[in-house]
């Protein structure tokens, strides 16, 4: 793979990802510390959003220590060169939340939908572009798109709604490099040359670095990651590792390798409540093609009902569940527990 001389823009998702091992307990001091330190290695764009995006204070997760606006207004004035992005989920975030974020100084809005439901993003993408924001159509669980469908969904966003970047998002960490190359290639062939493509990977199958390289080779100019690999499941693409790999391959990132290594080791790792690694449950997420954020829900259900999280995740994958169906995990675990009890009685 020869990428010598190519440029790539890396985006840090650490604060969004920090909500997974430390669900919604992040303080203003922590929210300020991570972006301001990431500013030094010259990270160009930093995500500052709650787990469910703008307006995402939800009983599905945990109520955060602070609201979106408090976090944004605390961080953005302290950044010297990095820009700030925010996640917005149609059905959760509203135009009022969008206006608030832009008023706080957010420059990029990621409008996230399930990969086959991009049509629900029309109003949000259109409004974001009308207000002058760098606007991304963030297509989640991209592995679930049948061959040839991803380009159609993306064209809908770009031509009808005006997104200037489309993301292929491997939310389950399921895809292999050839699959990433194929999907990115389809997007690049169908989209206007001026429309950028991004790739967001998860490390559940240990493929985040390889998949990000495949995405970049296929035409993705924006690559997501997080320092120390923070993120759901086995985490996102570890940025410090990816920067080192890019440096070895002659790909220009504009990021200071030693400084981002230090941020990961000295600041982020000590903030973790638990290590992020490819354990059996995270590996099952990737193998079964399950939304990475389901991991903690499945582990909680295991403790409550005695059904192994791995078995719950495999069944969720078999049923083709998608992000937003967290309530099904509890019901499924209860059903599986009852079925096991009946088997014991009949035996």
Curated annotation (Swiss-Prot):
Binding positions (Mn(2+)): 200, 202
Catalytic activity, reaction form: (S)-4-hydroxy-2-oxopentanoate = acetaldehyde + pyruvate
UniProt-listed GO biological process terms: catabolic process; L-leucine biosynthetic process
Gene Ontology MF term list: 2-isopropylmalate synthase activity; 4-hydroxy-2-oxovalerate aldolase activity; manganese ion binding
Pfam families per the UniProt record, alphabetical: DmpG_comm, HMGL-like
Residue positions binding substrate: 171, 200, 291
Catalytic EC class: lyase
EC number per UniProt: 4.1.3.39
Active site per UniProt: 20 (proton acceptor)
Keyword set, alphabetical order: Aromatic hydrocarbons catabolism, Lyase, Manganese, Metal-binding
Ranges for domain Pyruvate carboxyltransferase: 8-261
Cysteine disulfide partners in this protein: none
InterPro entries assigned: 2-IPM_HCS-like, 4OH_2_O-val_aldolase, Aldolase_TIM, DmpG_comm, DRE_TIM_HOA, PYR_CT
Similarity field: Belongs to the 4-hydroxy-2-oxovalerate aldolase family.
Protein name (Swiss-Prot/TrEMBL): 4-hydroxy-2-oxovalerate aldolase 1
Species, as recorded: Metapseudomonas furukawaii (Pseudomonas furukawaii)
